[in-house]
Curated annotation (Swiss-Prot):
It comes from Mycolicibacterium vanbaalenii (strain DSM 7251 / JCM 13017 / BCRC 16820 / KCTC 9966 / NRRL B-24157 / PYR-1). The gene is argB. The record marks 30, 247 as: Transition state stabilizer. The keyword Transferase applies. Belongs to the acetylglutamate kinase family. ArgB subfamily. It catalyses: N-acetyl-L-glutamate + ATP = N-acetyl-L-glutamyl 5-phosphate + ADP. This is Acetylglutamate kinase.
Length: 291
């Protein structure tokens, strides 16, 4: 479908209330899933970030790299495993994750954004003490299970990110971080995005996924919800697929930490960030605090 000039003007005018509401606000976006592997979607995501920045909104990108890490592990002949939705991280796996996240995935996204101008700067959780990690376990069949060098975020130092925002840059964050003793951990990008959104007092947290949003009775396609409150979401958590658990935990953490809304959106939709932020229909599920 080709839009007329009037149609294009109407689209821009319709976005005005959302643009006004988000002006000078921080939006943390967790970049992952198919949006990271499809060239068309990667280009659209980069354009979305530049659009937000040039509309007076402050995007902060936190990226994963699961498919790329898995591909590199396979190429190197290193076994990989997941438990409770989290990657089991041995020292060998950590070395690969560190290399892939900052040197490949983050660098590619920075370059895509910077095709529009000198906007993006890549940093890791190790830089300027951005994240301080603490070792974590996950629940598997009701049992706390060790998953190696996987951390949670114990502290966030937002100084470096705020300096980049003040300079008009788009921070692109890789989620490798040390603990207080200097031991380095792989932090799930969903977890890191939520902690950073809370620490930055972000207006929104957006989580890109490979599904249309949140299903309350998966795989029943009719159970897709456009909005849910945090109490109802917490009740659903034990019933969710393992891969969705870190994302929903992240949404709840952000909401409990004062972020007004968290959004689980379909990263397979071109320009999904703009669709979610600036249209009534959206591109996923919005999570809000219970009243």
């Amino acid at each position: 479908m080709t839009l007329t000039t009037s149609d294009k003007a109407a689209v821009l005018a319709d976005a005005l209330p959302w643009l006004t509401a988000l002006n000078d606000k921080i939006v943390v976006v967790k970049y992952g899933g198919n949006a990271m592997t499809d060239d068309r979607l990667k280009a659209a995501f980069a354009a979305d970030m530049v659009f937000l920045r040039n509309c007076g909104i402050h995007p902060v990108v936190v990226h994963g790299g699961g498919p790329q890490i898995s591909a590199m592990l396979k190429k190197l002949g290193i076994a990989g495993d997941f438990k409770g939705g989290f990657r089991v991280t041995t020292p060998e796996v950590l070395d690969v994750a560190r290399m892939v996240l900052f040197g490949q995935v983050g660098r590619e996204l920075v370059n895509l954004i910077n095709a529009y101008g000198p906007y993006a700067v890549g940093i890791t959780g190790e830089d300027a003490h951005l994240f301080t990690a603490v070792r974590r376990t996950v629940m598997v069949d009701g049992v706390a299970t060790d998953i190696g060098l996987v951390g949670d975020v114990e502290r966030v130092n937002t100084d470096a990110v705020l300096d980049l925002i003040d300079a008009g840059r788009i921070p692109v964050v890789s989620t490798i971080a040390p603990d207080t003793d200097g031991l380095v951990y792989n932090i799930n990008a969903d977890t890191a995005a939520a902690a950073l959104a809370e620490a930055l007092s972000a207006e929104k947290l957006l989580m890109l996924t490979d599904v249309e949003g949140l299903y309350t009775r998966w795989p029943d396609r009719d159970s897709l919800v456009s909005q849910i409150d945090s109490d109802a979401l917490a009740e659903l958590l034990p019933t969710l697929e393992a891969g969705m658990v870190p994302k929903i935990e992240a949404c709840l953490r952000a909401i409990d930490g004062g972020v007004p809304s968290a959004h689980v959106i379909d990263g397979r939709v071109e320009h999904c960030v703009l669709v979610e932020l600036f249209t009534d229909e959206g591109a996923g599920t919005k999570v809000v605090q219970s009243t």
